[in-house]
From Swiss-Prot:
Gene3D superfamilies: Ribosomal protein L17. Keywords: Ribonucleoprotein, Ribosomal protein. One of its GO terms (molecular function) is structural constituent of ribosome. Belongs to the bacterial ribosomal protein bL17 family. One of its GO terms (cellular component) is cytosolic large ribosomal subunit. The gene is rplQ. HAMAP family: Ribosomal_bL17 (MF_01368). It holds the Pfam family Ribosomal_L17. This is Large ribosomal subunit protein bL17. Coiled coil: none annotated. It comes from Fervidobacterium nodosum (strain ATCC 35602 / DSM 5306 / Rt17-B1). The keyword Ribonucleoprotein applies. One of its GO terms (biological process) is translation.
Length: 127
């Protein structure tokens, strides 16, 4: 039975999968859009949406509850490992989505990769 088997393992062990998701998140925060396989894009979308949700919460409460805002920034830093990206996520990307509940990213299927025929998609942050 496949109960509670929601996530795709991507044929990788746990630490490799976490590293892959972290790298996808770093690239999309830095560049705004990335091209990858469709399966990686769909799994990465879930991961990135959670990070952006934390960033939006940190942005909304930065004036009222300083401690909680700092705690959320530290959680983002633990996931990303780069202060510049955390600052960009909270200060530049999060303000665009304060009135939005989810749906911060989109996956657009592009076609097949020429070398191996893998289905390729573009993962981008919605403007």
């Amino acid at each position: 039975m496949r109960h509670r088997m929601k996530r795709n393992k991507l044929n990788r062990y746990g630490s490799h999968r976490r590293s892959l998701m972290r790298n996808l998140a770093k690239e999309i925060i830095e560049h705004g859009t990335i091209m990858t396989t469709t399966v990686k894009a769909k799994v990465g979308k879930e991961y990135i949406e959670k990070l952006i949700t934390k960033a939006v919460k940190a942005y909304k409460i930065k004036d009222e509850n300083k401690e909680e805002s700092i705690a959320l920034r530290r959680q983002l830093f633990a996931e990303l490992g780069d202060r510049k990206l955390v600052n960009k996520l909270v200060d530049e990307i999060a303000p665009k989505y304060t009135g939005r509940n989810g749906g911060y990213t989109r996956v657009i299927k592009v076609g097949q990769r020429r070398g191996d025929g893998a289905e390729v998609s573009v993962l981008q942050i919605v403007e």
